[in-house]
Amino acid sequence: PDEADVIAIAGMGGETIIHILENAPWTKDGSHQLLLQPMTKAADLRRWLSVNGYTFTSERLVWDKGYLYPVLCVKGGSCPTLTEKQLLCGVKLADDPLYGDYLALHAGKLHKTAAGLRQSRREDAAQRAAALEALAEELEKERGSL
């Protein structure tokens, strides 16, 4: 732990990154900057980080082989409660040149998930679909204002 100031964990899923950090509690002491690049489950990773003693210092987006990935920079510290939009689309990405693309990507996924829920017979499916559509519309509105 004392041999590095910056630690990069990249190229794996958010769940795997969470597992690594759960087994390295010293990363929360505030003396290490973590560069995290989840290939999947970025929202789950953001949620876990925010409730487990990490604060977001910056975020950036990168295109790689046709995919858009977030790079999260965090360190130990308290984090305010994140909104669903922040969990999904990032905490510090508003100035990123690829942010509009990221919003469009997530809005499309939300619309697709909502359409699937509308086919469901589950009792809460319609309510959940409406919430996802509302979030998708919020993302599209923000993208339009960029």
Question: Where are these predicted regions, by residue range?
Answer:
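A short beta-strand submotif of the Rossmann-like class I SAM-dependent methyltransferase core
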Residues: I9-A10
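Class I S-adenosyl-L-methionine
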Residues: E3-V6, E15-L146
